């Protein structure tokens, strides 16, 4: 392995994470570097321009057709007759084709095909029950949450129900158009609460989170990785790419993390677990929360390793390493789902937006990873990618106990067992010493008591006056008053 002596590392200017229009919000590769707000503006401009161009094209074609028709009317009679017969034949043939197509796509055949598709796609009853239970739970939580807002809550619930009903009839639209509908709904509801309802911004954010949770729990199975997109193809491509890059080491990426430290190793495992867990969530906000937790574990791992706070230049290479090591399932589908249906304000600002933007950059870096990025020669990079060799194989040629990860872990465990054995021996010695001290203390107390008893013996002396017997005769009884004089009964 030929590594250059000077390592550049992976550096991304923080300004590159921001919207390229300069609005100050975070951009997104899926939005061509724009933030959600600027992308919507650019998208609408491009769409209006396309509509205008299509309208002009239609007008031009109509004029050409009218001119061609006018010129055909001025042609000779014979040619006109021949052309009319040709048109009649063409019309009859076209009518037969249309009739055949109509029969093929008749109502009965359409219904049958839909039933077949639904039966083919129908999940198991257990999955349906689980989804229904979760949907009911989220619905109840949403209604209970809106009850605290009284009239505003009623209006929000009404608008949300109307939106879901509208989305039910828009399933035939492209996923981009459905995403546009969701983004418009988020924008309109938030704006209506701020302008008409005078709701404080922090409460608007909480309400929007609950709205997103409610609607996306219901829409998830229809809009996550739909068949009309190439999301699944991208998932397979990035998984194949990550598997091909399994030989990449932390040193090649200049990752400032030492996994030999147990605390750091635990943080790395937790980060990988969080990024994998993202696929199990249904709400975009929950998926973002997994990315945020993963990123915080990365920052903690770097902080423990370096004994100082992590920087942005340390974070991105480590995030790339975590993605390569974890190979999260359906990574592109999850990124696209968050981009399309998450509340845009959450992606534009805050730590969620920052970490998500970095994840998008990490995926883009992995897709474009080359020899120069890893400070390798092109020859070594090609051999590693083809599987002919790997950096670990080359290190194993000069084998030492530290070169093998399994042996290294074994020695680490043996060292840990040795430390535990020493601690146990210390505890046993301390316990024996404590037992001996207790015995010595007991013997000392017994000796002291014996010495005191011998020094001060207990002597019982007889009394100087005899004790009065209880049953003896008392000659002075007659001096007592009558109520107190004892009475003697003959028995």
UniProtKB/Swiss-Prot annotation:
Start and end residues of each stretch annotated as Interaction with ubiquitinated proteins: 1-74
Region entry Disordered, spans: 66-85, 462-491
Keyword set, alphabetical order: Acetylation, Cytoplasm, Endocytosis, Endosome, Metal-binding, Phosphoprotein, Protein transport, Transport, Ubl conjugation, Ubl conjugation pathway, Zinc, Zinc-finger
PTM section of the record: Monoubiquitinated.
Biased composition (Low complexity): 69-84
Residues that, per the record, bind Zn(2+): 19, 23, 35, 38
InterPro entries: DUF5601 (IPR041545), VPS9 (IPR003123), Vps9-like (IPR045046), VPS9_dom_sf (IPR037191), Znf_A20 (IPR002653)
GO molecular function annotation: DNA binding; guanyl-nucleotide exchange factor activity; small GTPase binding; ubiquitin protein ligase activity; zinc ion binding
Position of the signal peptide: none
Residues covered by the VPS9 domain: 232-375
Modified residues (Phosphoserine): 124, 132, 373, 377, 390, 400
Subunit structure: Interacts with RGS14; the interaction is GTP-dependent. Heterodimer with RABEP1. The heterodimer binds RAB4A and RAB5A that have been activated by GTP-binding. Interacts with RAB21, and with 100-fold lower affinity also with RAB22. Binds TSC2, GGA1, GGA2, GGA3, AP1G1 and AP1G2. Interacts with ubiquitinated EGFR.
Protein name per UniProt: Rab5 GDP/GTP exchange factor
Organism: Homo sapiens (Human)
